Amino acid sequence: MSWRGRSTYYWPRPRRYVQPPEVIGPMRPEQFSDEVEPATPEEGEPATQRQDPAAAQEGEDEGASAGQGPKPEADSQEQGHPQTGCECEDGPDGQEMDPPNPEEVKTPEEGEKQSQC
């Protein structure tokens, strides 16, 4: 039996122990005062501009979708996949259609064009 060389598996090295933040000491908030404190609104600024923009959009979306009703799922799937001009599709699983048998495939005549998928 021949020698195979050095093993490629190395034992994991022991991890260094790092003291948790509680042991090191508390953080001083005065160091980070600019990041922690939110900006106060000015007196002339109206409070309506400070609303959450996501909440405002939800209200608009609810009003727009209430008149239209639920959309079919097929529409949302078609929007996700743009048409490439080729109408050949396999099927939902992509495995339903077998590749054509070369003996049964008809060769296109000179005047016809065959779509290539």
From Swiss-Prot:
SMART domains for this protein: GAGE
Coiled-coil region: none
Region (Disordered): 1-117
Source superkingdom: Eukaryota
Entry comment describing in which tissues the protein is expressed: Expressed in a variety of tumor tissues but not in normal tissues, except testis.
Signal peptide residues on this chain, from the entry's feature table: none
InterPro entries: GAGE, GAGE_fam
Basic and acidic residues composition-biased segments: 103-117
Listed Acidic residues bias regions: 32-45, 87-96
Remaining remarks: This gene belongs to a family of genes organized in clustered repeats. They have a high degree of predicted sequence identity, but differ by scattered single nucleotide substitution. Their sequences contain either the antigenic peptide YYWPRPRRY or YRPRPRRY which is recognized by cytotoxic T-cells.
Family the UniProt entry places it in: Belongs to the GAGE family.
PANTHER family: G ANTIGEN 1-RELATED (PTHR14047:SF30), P ANTIGEN FAMILY MEMBER 5-RELATED (PTHR14047)
Protein name: G antigen 5
Organism listed in the record: Homo sapiens
Phylogenetic lineage: Eukaryota, Metazoa, Chordata, Craniata, Vertebrata
